[in-house]
Amino acid sequence: TDDPSQDSIENDAEEDSPGPKLSVRFSKIETLKAKDFSDCSSVELRELHQLIGNLKFSSSKRASLRKRDTKRNPKKLNVSKSIRKAFETDGEPIYLKYSRKDTRPRRLVLLLDVSGSMEPYARALIRLAHAAVVGRADVEAFTLGTRLTRITRELTSRDPDAALRSAADSVRDWSGGTRLGATLAEFNNEWGIRGYARGALLVMLSDGWDRGSPDVLRTQMERLQRVTHRLIWVNPLKHTPGYAPLAQGMAAALPYTDEFIEGHSFDSLERLTEIISS
């Protein structure tokens, strides 16, 4: 005969099965990842900030002037080393030497707009900058508002909360006005053109609102484009239905960007890391 207690055990097992609960949890996380930061509660933002902290920034490579000995690519004959080696065998080129160009990580420069219009997104973007600074070499981070502030050193702490507090304390124009052209000019003159920007992958994170002259911003973007390897503009407003880059700052800057992408959600920032690493 059938044991009625067996049905009870099976029903209990089905109720206790983690499958449906995990599925619901996974669905909620995926929904949260696609949610606009400006629509998130404080609890949701905390969870998203943790996810942002786990994003990986692989280093794209650039060719170095240095060469490395190799046995794998016989097409790259190192003539000078082969001749020197031949002197050890009475001038006979018995041992040929090969080399290839060495590679180095390409510098990543992050410029973050912390003006009032970027308030709903700024903290998530600072979290992103922290993940980049602690996750790979050759990363520089600056904030832009009414002034330029370098925050690379403040973001080097492995503790994300401590790093963000330190960065926030050093940024005096947080949630203030916007002078993108003027602050970009300061970056170009003091840090960028002869240093950090040259050959770098530069990421501008801004909604493009600027109270200054669009001609100034246009000039500074043109200068940046000439020296950077690649210039990416991340705009949190780009995902908005019907959006067009009509703000005078964004319209002035757009012709000098290599890629123009969204930056309003975790999913969009994850896509940015993929572009950076490619």
Predicted regions and their residues:
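Acidic/polar low-complexity segments with low predicted structural confidence
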Residues: T1-P105
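DG-centered beta-turn motif at the end of beta-strands
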Residues: I83, L111-S115, G199-G212, D258
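Von Willebrand factor
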Residues: D102-S170, L180-E186, L201-M204, L237
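Extended hydrophobic-aromatic, low-complexity segments
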Residues: Y121, A141, T152-R153, I193-G199, ...
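Conserved nucleotide-binding/hydrolysis micro-motifs of P-loop NTPases
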Residues: T146-T149, W209-D210, K238-T240, D267-S268
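Extended, charge-rich low-complexity interaction segments
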Residues: A163-A185, F260-I275
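C-terminal structural cap/anchor segments
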Residues: W174-G208, S213-R218
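Von Willebrand factor type A / integrin I
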Residues: M221-S278
